[in-house]
UniProtKB/Swiss-Prot annotation:
CDD domains: 7tmA_Chemokine_R. It comes from Canis lupus familiaris (Dog). High affinity receptor for the C-C type chemokines CCL17/TARC and CCL22/MDC. The activity of this receptor is mediated by G(i) proteins which activate a phosphatidylinositol-calcium second messenger system. Could play a role in lipopolysaccharide (LPS)-induced endotoxic shock. In the CNS, could mediate hippocampal-neuron survival. This is C-C chemokine receptor type 4. The chain crosses the membrane at residues 40-67, 78-98, 112-133, 151-175, 207-226, 243-267, 285-308. The gene is CCR4. Disulfide bonds join C110-C187. Belongs to the G-protein coupled receptor 1 family.
Length: 360
């Protein structure tokens, strides 16, 4: 074998090795279809959530200020829950436009809207948890609640709740950034390559503060409420128990899927799960479960406000004074037909059932 043959053999081996080495390099996971899906479905869904959430929670705020005038801890929590949901839904037009096109609002608004979204997210869930504790005190510890469930304590705990929500949302403010990739501008939470710890902590924070602690609190409070109501011989007891189950089931049904998907996304970020097909399905699941969770802020006014007899009465009074569209006035008359003239209740003050009835 001469030097030319050796050179040819070496060249052939090099081409062979390069070919198979290239074949073994993992190909990038393409997700163009996911973006197209988001562009088509997310903007109209976000728009619907924005409209219904804005309308429902605005009515709650107006009724509370016009008729209730914040006389109790429950009123304070209802007001703050409505403000939390309003803060949350006001960020949706920006995310809707972003899903349809790209981020065009600059770095400043990217940080502000991301932070506002998270503050609304955390504070809304925290106030739902406080509503559960408020009902627990009113029904299970009725005597003690006369001292604890005051307007002053309601304001103090609300301020503390907003402080915790703001602090929990700081990572969104600090790490949200704008960047351009393939002529497309993004607004995302972006960590440095060596900050895996922050990714894990942020996901765990959402799972723990957004689901585990609130759900655990609600399960404890409502199980004790049901236990107390079982000893009450009352014709409206079954309705109250059904409403308790509805509150827990709706919270679990709307928020648990989103938290599970976020946990799986964390495993992908940590490279525990590595499969392109799974990642694509996970991205679809994130879009679907996130939108499902958004809908819960539209249901909060119905769950915690409109289903109470007193609040329905106030709502009828509000629409009686309206000079708006004909359909709203027709809806007003329909509400009046199904609402009692007086907020009758057979719950006694000693058991606190009247508070549950009004809140639900």
């Amino acid at each position: 074998m001469n030097p030319t043959d050796i050179a040819d053999t070496t060249l052939d081996e090099s081409i062979y090795n390069n070919y198979y080495l290239y074949e073994n390099i993992p190909k990038p996971c393409t997700k163009e279809g996911i973006k197209a899906f988001g562009e088509l479905f997310l903007p109209p869904l976000y728009s619907l959530v924005f409209l219904f959430g804005l309308l429902g929670n605005s009515v709650v705020v107006v009724v509370l200020f016009k008729y209730k005038r914040l006389k109790s801890m429950t009123d304070v929590y209802l007001l703050n829950l409505a403000i939390s949901d309003l803060l949350f839904v006001l960020s949706l037009p920006f995310w809707g436009y972003y899903a349809a096109d790209q981020w065009v609002f600059g770095l400043g608004l990217c940080k502000i809207i991301s932070w506002m979204y998270l503050v609304g997210f955390y504070s809304g869930i925290f106030f739902i948890m406080l509503m559960s504790i408020d009902r627990y005190l009113a029904i299970v510890h009725a005597v003690f609640s006369l001292r604890a469930r005051t307007l002053t304590y309601g304001v103090i705990t609300s301020l503390a709740t907003w402080s915790v929500a703001v602090l929990a949302s700081l990572p969104g403010l600090l790490f949200s950034t704008c960047y351009t990739e393939r002529n497309h501008t993004y607004c995302k939470t972006k960590y440095s390559r060596n900050s895996t710890r922050w990714k894990v902590l942020s996901s765990l924070e959402i799972n723990i503060l957004g689901l585990v602690i609130p759900l655990g609190t609600m399960l404890f409070c409502y199980s004790m409420i049901i236990r107390t109501l079982q000893h009450c011989k009352n014709e409206k007891k079954s309705k109250a128990v059904r409403m308790v189950f509805a509150v827990v089931a709706l919270f679990l049904g709307f928020w648990a899927p989103y938290n599970v998907v976020l946990f799986l996304e964390t495993l992908v970020e940590l490279e525990v799960l590595q499969d392109c097909t799974f990642e694509r399905h996970l991205d679809y699941a994130i879009q679907a479960t996130e939108t499902l969770a958004f809908v819960h802020c539209c249901l909060n006014p119905v769950i915690y406000f409109f289903l109470g007899e007193k609040f329905r009465k106030y709502l009828v009074q509000l629409f009686k004074t309206c000079r708006g569209p004909f359909m709203l006035c027709q809806y007003c008359r329909l509400l009046q037909m199904y609402s009692p003239d007086t907020p009758s209740s057979s719950y006694t003050q000693s058991t606190g059932d009247h508070d549950l009835h009004d809140a639900l």
